[in-house]
Amino acid sequence: DLAPLRHFWFTSSKGRRIHNMLLTPPGFDPSKKYPLFVVIHGGPHTMWRDQWVLRWNYHLLAAPGYVLLFTNYSGSTGFGEAAAQTIQGDPLRTAGEELNEAADIAIRDHAYIDATRQCAGGASYGGHLANWLQATTTRYRCLISHAGLINLESQWGTSDTIYGREINNGGPVWEQGPVWREQNPIRYAAQFRTPTLVTVGERDFRVPLNNSLEYWSVLQRQQIPSRLLVFPD
């Protein structure tokens, strides 16, 4: 009972054409209501494809009864070099807006999606964006963040991708350009409200453990229902 992926496009609030895929669960009944899981890809320079994926098994994720939404947000590959570079200087805000807009359109066009039960999650850059959603919206009932940064500044100082961070964020951290100030999720900690599962590998050198610990500390300090899972590798 493997449903096909349903493709759709929309024009974002910034005038960009955004590609998406929707997947229904096994035993799908269009007369019923299903929770929506917004699955966020990492990278950001990669893309969701209509194919079998070993790392992310679409049908396995949908099996508990979720409708899955996959959005190729700004910065995704496969749509030309210019499209991939739109995330430079705007690493989180626009991509986050596009994820929310995609969910709005999926809910509008498919009556079987329960708008009151939305979840979002991802790993690596997908975790970064899940954390940005924590900072900017309360629409999701829960969030899942694997190896996601919560603090641009400490991520710059401990990750192995310092140069790439500077390109995306408009310069080194000490110059304190607008991205460092305005698109750093931890600066919005007072607004955090959404229950969250935080996971990370203890030996992750791309998004080191410290960022997950910072996030966990904020969630606990804010008394937000949350769990931290650290893998020993």
Can you annotate each of these PLM segments?
Residues 28-34, 39-80, 152:
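Short substrate-entry loop that stabilizes the transition state in hydrolases
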Residues 23, 39-40, 121, 199:
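Short hydrophobic segments within beta-strands
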